[in-house]
Regions:
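C-terminal outer-membrane/trafficking sorting elements
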Residues: 1-4, 8-82
Length: 82
């Protein structure tokens, strides 16, 4: 899982690979609270992109978490002030 740009000000594009099957991507804040569910569905194997619009969330560190079958990956993302 990766994202660009990083740091970002209002939105970032998250790219992820899946081996197929159920895929969950969430964004968590520095306290571990889920602030966004970006996708929660079945995907065929492949590489995908999804946009995270941070809206009114404060600047700071966030984490994109990918769960696919038994795989979990976490990507740190920094929201900067505009």
């Amino acid at each position: 899982i990766s994202n660009y740009p990083n740091p970002f000000t209002s939105s970032t594009v998250i790219t992820f690979k899946t081996a197929g099957g159920h895929t969950l991507i969430q964004v968590l804040d520095a306290s571990g609270r889920v602030v966004a569910n970006l996708t929660d569905k079945d995907y065929p194997a492949g590489t995908y992109t999804i946009v995270f619009n941070s809206g009114s969330l404060p600047s700071g560190m966030y984490y994109a978490r990918l769960q696919n079958m038994t795989i979990q990956q976490v990507r740190p993302m920094m929201k900067a002030r505009p």
